[in-house]
Amino acid sequence: KSCCRNTLARNCYNACRFTGGSQPTCGILCDCIHVTTTTCPSSHPS
């Protein structure tokens, strides 16, 4: 599960992934993180 700081970061991440970017690369570029749980931390709610 990916978690982003806000909607802008989420849109960035989705666009990055759509164009073939890897999860780690898109996470770094768009300030998103990946979690193994079903909920996101408060620092990355989106």
Swiss-Prot record:
The keyword Disulfide bond applies. One of its GO terms (cellular component) is extracellular region. Coiled coil: none annotated. Keywords: Disulfide bond, Plant defense, Secreted, Toxin. It comes from the Eukaryota. InterPro entries: Thionin, Thionin-like_sf. Disulfide bonds join C3-C40, C4-C32, C12-C30, C16-C26. The keyword Disulfide bond applies. Gene3D superfamilies: Thionin-like (3.30.1350.10). Its main location: secreted. One of its GO terms (biological process) is defense response. GO terms for molecular function: toxin activity. It is found in: Secreted. Thionins are small plant proteins which are toxic to animal cells. They seem to exert their toxic effect at the level of the cell membrane. Their precise function is not known. Belongs to the plant thionin (TC 1.C.44) family. 4 C-C subfamily. This is Hellethionin-D. It comes from Helleborus purpurascens (Purple hellebore). The lineage of its organism: Eukaryota, Viridiplantae, Streptophyta, Embryophyta, Tracheophyta.
